[in-house]
Amino acid sequence: MIQKDEIRQVLESAKALGIEFAELFFEDREETNIPCVETVIQGVKSLRICGAGLYLIQGLSNVYLYTNQVTKEALLDLVKKGAEMLEIKARAAAAGIVLTEKSYHNPCPVVKYPSQISNQDKINVLLEADKAARSAGVNVRSLNVNYFDTDQRVLIANTEGLYTTDRRVTTRMRMQAVVADGDSAYGTWDDYTKASGFEAYDDELSYTSFAKDMVKRADRIRTAGSISPCTVPVVLAAGGCGTLWHESCGHSLEAIAIAHRSSAFVDKIGEKVASDKVTLVDDGTLPGQYGSAAIDDEGHPMQRNILIENGVL
């Protein structure tokens, strides 16, 4: 693994080339995927991703480069390529960078890391969830259950002296089912997701109840009558609906979109952009919640950001 002093030298090389801002993002991520198709385990898939990303900013121009060669020499070469892409001509006087290491509280503590758990234990929870879904009193025509876990270690450093790390662990079980009765069938999927380690499965009732509820809910939808044309309120439930907010508002509020004035929200702070009923909060500090962490991917501590309040940006 690259050393802190080597990271400092890479960042200093960026400044010496005249680059205004440089940020290094190191990642070492392990993933496991175990698919179960119609009660049959399809094998265990393990993946490890290790590398570094380099983000450079010069005025309103920016480039992102990456490599799986996490060495000082490879990163120095990446900096030179980035400077060429930014078409930087003038070099700057050598300036020393002091990297100050900071650590922050992680709102999602882990008890059982995925690497500490045998594949057989992971397979067992898959089969238990499968069995629970099939015993829910619903005619399940087909059922696939997938187990996933991720253990991501990150290190972020930049030319402003930031140096920090985080470890993010998630565990997920995805269920895909088709419930049927004769020619009437309905297919759906849902995720049992926890921002934790394998302790997510300590309470067997929790994930087996999830499995039963998922197929029962699918059967209720299958047997539901058609709705008559009418005007109804739009209600966004907790969970996956957060993706709708992310796509409709999140990207438009990103710094790059604002800087390039390509967002509909440019110069709209303090103005009405939505209904009075809309309040949008981005909170990465909620304990045990998926998406919470100690830091974001720029190395800043997570916080509660009110993006839209009562319709006002």
Positions of the model-derived regions?
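Active-site bordering "gate/hinge" segments
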Residues: 1-304, 309-312
